[in-house]
Amino acid sequence: MHWSDRIAQEIIRRRPDKEEYVCAAGISPSGSIHIGNFRDIATSYFVVKALRRQGKKARLLFSWDEFDRLRKIPVNVAKIARPEGEKPWDEYIGYPYVDVPNPYDDGCPNYAKHFENEFEEAMERFGIHMDYRYQAEMNRSGKYAQYVIHALKKRGEIFDILDSFRTQSAQEGERENYYPVSIYCPHCGRDTTKILSLSDDCTVAEYECACGHKGTFDFTKDFNCKLAWKIDWPMRWMYEGVNFEPGGKDHASPGGSYDTSRVIAKKIFDFEAPIFQGYEFIGIKGATGKMSGSSGLNLTPDTLLKLYQPEMILWLYAKSEPTKAFDFCFDDGILRQYFEFDKQYNDFMEGKGDEFLNTVMANCLLETGEEDGKPVYRKIETVPMSLLVQLGSVVDFNVPMLETVFGKIGQPFTYEQFKDRLDRAKYWLEQCSPENVNRLRPYRNWEVYETLNEEEKKEIALLHDYIKNGGYDLDELNQELYAIPKKVMGELQDPKELKKIQGQFFKNVYRLLIDKEKGPRLYLFLYAIEPEKYVSLLDFSTPMTEEEKQSLIKEEPAPEETEKKQVPLGEPDPVEPIREEIDIEEFSRMDMRVCKVLKCTEIRKSHSCYKLTLFDGLKERVIVSSIKSYYTPEEMIGKKIIVIANLKPARFSGVTSEGMLLAATNNACGCQVIFVDDIVPEGTRIC
């Protein structure tokens, strides 16, 4: 049974007679909505579909938490200049998102609406239709006013519930001065207010703001306020009648937001908390960086749609249990994902799928209508993505030439069949895997040719003559490529030796044509391209030309970099508010210690990460760090750094990292690793 069906059955078991079930999700529009947040929507979406399959009415409720405070300015927004005379971005920290100006010239009235529209348009491309709630309007219209007053009346009980989940004891007077609501200041617009007193009926408060403003707030008339998160969340469960809501593993942890809010829902709002499903975060393979909407990295659903078809993105979420992590692949792992999806899709369409596979596909395929009471799905043409990438690279993604090549190799796909994947193949190759772009050399590669022995040179001459004479089909070309080494070397008795010589021949051809030791399947590559474009690159019967001599000079490698890497810097990042305080016990659990860098090596296919081998005083350990843009390996080897040694191991760029180094990162200085004086022994604790 698929996990979405299992959750749907539990929802029905709890409330068998409910007319309509509500599955919820929600996000703050802090920036472009990233793919980690999308798991919130996907999880609820699949449960809604499962409920409907079981004959129940269900809807997907989505809350835009646009009335939350702006905590920090995303990097990409901070780079946008404010109009002359307008206050800078960092002065909007503490404002609700809906009151922050729109950074972009797109007609949206505010910051929140820009990012909301961006996300909602992407959801249409997934065929996901939601019942949206805009929390600024919900709060400011007074819809929650009675529940705010109710929470104020119960503030002592709420404090006791919150306090029961804390490890440290409450300070004297803390309970009496606790108010579960934030007031947005009418003078400065921020939530930097403090309630000083509350009327006996809990409807009127006296408050002051950090800006110096003081005032009276009537909760029956003034609605520019918001309940604290762990009270607001259960209040909205009750208000909307929510039956199911997922959340990240931070909310799902013991004593986390859900555990606390569940108790508040029951004891304060007399509502049974919805079924909750925690989910793991999403990984990115082949790219690095913190995946956060406010970081400015823009790893959004819209970005993913440039690489994956919408059904594939939903498929990756649907086939994985919510508690299991999975990766979106920017490296060649994406080709394996396309292959796996195509196989499962074809099995489903041919009626060969089991119950689990059929449910996965029913969850991820886009419905276009209904026939005989069953959904009709958008047809997917399973043109092999790996082949499209290979051949597209060969013919520079020219559509008529691609159709011709597909026909030549016995797979006559038309543009109508491969158009949905064509731009995605080109985008992946050029943006994510430029090292796999195959371009013919402009001149003969004399440097490589002169390293070949006489037999290898003869092989190249035979291939040149065969291509020049023409008159072959695809199969004949493939056979000739394997036969040429035999013609030169004679019949070899040892199959392994023959295979080795044939492999070296193929490698030599690739090096002469595209400066690489491997490439697309050679017979396809040579057959797909017009011979006139490359046959001269195999002809070394004439002397080196002046252009070729000049190209050798131009292609001499630059001296090995020894100076410190220079990275463009900019204005300082906005200073962030101090984070939530931790107690001494929590701090003492962090094991920070001095480690010596023994090795520093590049990670294949990672543009920003090094693999560092360290000695921590007890043993060697490996960490991964995205400092490649800022330091050369020589600058790191032999240095002593500070590492969080008891951080749970995690995989980055295919390498398991056993800790994290400490560094200061700011737009004004780039990344500055914190080095320790060599006099400090390895293994020394930092406290």
Predicted regions and their residues:
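N-terminal Rossmann-like or analogous alpha/beta NTP/dinucleotide-binding catalytic cores
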Residues: 1-159, 261-263
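C-terminal accessory/binding modules appended to enzymatic or scaffolding proteins
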Residues: 448-511, 582-611
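Small-residue-rich helix-loop
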Residues: 405-467, 474, 481, 485
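Glycine- and acidic
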Residues: 24-33, 133, 239-250, 297-299, ...
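Active-site cores that bind ATP or allylic diphosphates and position pyrophosphate for catalysis
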Residues: 102, 128-301
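Phosphate-backbone binding interfaces of nucleic-acid-interacting proteins
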Residues: 553-687
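Conserved oxyanion/phosphate-binding beta-strand-loop segments in alpha/beta enzyme cores
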Residues: 1-19, 217-229, 594-602, 612
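Catalytic adenosine-cofactor/nucleotide-binding cores of aminoacyl-tRNA synthetases and other
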Residues: 253, 258, 280-434, 514-553
